[in-house]
Amino acid sequence: YGLGSANKDLPAFVVLLSKNTDPQAQPIYARLWGSSFLPSNHQGVKFRSGADPVLYLKDPTGDTPKGRRQLLDSLSELNQIRQAETGNPEINTRIAAYEMAHRMQMSVPDLTDLSKEPESTFKLYGEDARNPGSHAANCLLARRLCERGVRFIQLYHRGWDHHSNIPGRHPKITKETDQGSAALVMDL
């Protein structure tokens, strides 16, 4: 029950990393959303900060959805042949990832389109929610992911590891995170 997504078009585990606003912010490593002892299909899928959270949502110029489907089917056949030869379970994970990416081409644009959100939502989350990649926008996106059946959403906002100028830096970062975080908790 707890593993997998309730939505076949989105991953079960999504990572949202806010745009870096602090030049001294600590780095965030992908191992933080790895699958550890679980199969790799349970690792987190990082959505990029900004207006285009997932690359290649649109087919390349000259390609059609039918052509893309044929390409994926051919690639799947080749991967299945290789999997039969080697018995490597990671090949099945790769096939599933290609299929998920194809389905995400349809679901992510609707997910990230905030134009249908009422003005009251932006009052609740703050005006920064209109700025793709901001913490407030990621909180709103997390709510929308949750509504669509994504079971685990991890929000990262760097810059909390202050070792100097705490009175100068801490108010700035709390201003960036407080309203969006509170709105997300209220919405959930």
Residue positions per predicted region:
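Ligand-binding pockets and gating/stacking loops
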Residues: 1-188
